[in-house]
Amino acid sequence: MKENAYEMPWRTNYEAMAAAGWLVGATGAIAAEMLSELPPEPFWWMTGISSGMALYRLPEAYRLYKLQKGLKGKPLAFMELSHLQKVMAKHPDELWLGYGFEWDQRHAQRAYEILKRDKQTLLNQGHGKQMGSTWIHGVEPKEEDVYLPVGHTEGHTLIVGTTGAGKTRCFDAMITQAILRNEAVIIIDPKGDKELKDNAQRACIAAGSPERFVYFHPGFPEHSVRLNPLRNFNRGTEIASRIAALIPSETGADPFKAFGQMALNNIVQGLLLTSQRPDLKTLRRFLEGGPEGLVVKAVTAWGEQVYPNFSVEIKRFTEKANTLAKQAMAMLLFYYERIQPVAANTDLEGLLSMFEHDRTHYSKMVASLMPVLNMLTSSELGPLLSPIANDVDDSRLITDSGRIINNAQVAYIGLDSLTDAMVGSAIGSLLLSDLTAVAGDRYNYGVENRPVNIFIDEAAEVVNDPFIQLLNKGRGDRKSTRLNS
């Protein structure tokens, strides 16, 4: 279309009417010549002129017909995986998005002309009245493959649309291409779309590495891998912050939430002091049952590091302690009398202060924290989210965000939010926080920094503060995030 050309494509197709009229004239001339005794030459001339005018009008009539027909929607396009592999081979540095066109001035003008008319006379009259604004594809009858440079996806991608509009199928195409590029892929799916999972697994098989696919779903624990959402962290305080973020709170300065976070941090620091890796079940055990056992181990670990003859002198304090609580109290006294003047440890003192706290008041203050830990460690979720590496009775694979990324695995993580929205949201938030910690490691240490693709369906259900940080800073460690909403 020329810059100054005038186009009104949504009007009545007068060219088709004119072509039909000229064809009728040509047919009439032929019939008259056959049925009359008049000289044939004038009829031949009439037939030729009418046919020529009809042929002159037909191309524009057909162009308008195709353009107007496109407004009524197009059938769904399907592509074989083998064909997609051929497309990727021709465009190795580009992401195939689908079929479309480059929007320019003529498309803007056509859209403007549609929007100022009564659209119901033009739109959604074919292909079963598909949902959405299918006419947008119709403003250009000649669609072609649309590509995006892979490097541009590091700026993250947001896909929006109503239910059933095709957001998840768009994910399918992006996920398949990321898998075929041998990149790490993490799919977080709150609703548990079986077709999305099957397509990801099928792509791994097509790539020749079916072992890369790992599956996590609380609703199918027997088929699920075990996944530790607290495995990756840079500082112990991160773990307390992750779990405390799950505590329901109506105000920004909730004392119950603050106390719960402090209690979590004290337990975490005690575990790290004894060279134990925190997990959800361990945290619940010490918060619910009391920190006495951890106090004994933590004071012992610190005393052996900094206090000479610790193993000899501690016996005088613990010789009459015949219960765990009395042993913990003896350890507390030994720390304050002997160790603190020599080598104080603020992390250990936080744990000791928690041990000294009034038990009744403590139970009330962590009342909002315990339901969160209970639901994440109960029944089948316990072994799933707090795996024990040396458990000989459980042969399920153990993985975490760091392993998924470093081994270029394809992790489908179903949250089963339709069954239990609260648990699904909590698991999703913990996993996103774990991914943020991995991003921090990649920034600090540059662990190969292979591309990582994170796909989050129904993102509003799992987004938290650490994930927003990941969006802001994830490009530097080659994390590409795609959100559906």
Regions found by a protein language model. Name each.
Residues 481-484:
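Conserved small/polar residues in nucleotide/adenosyl-binding loops
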Residues 140-142, 150-155, 160-163, 168-479:
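P-loop NTPase motor domains
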Residues 1-187, 194-210, 273, 316, ...:
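Accessory regions of macromolecular translocation/handling assemblies
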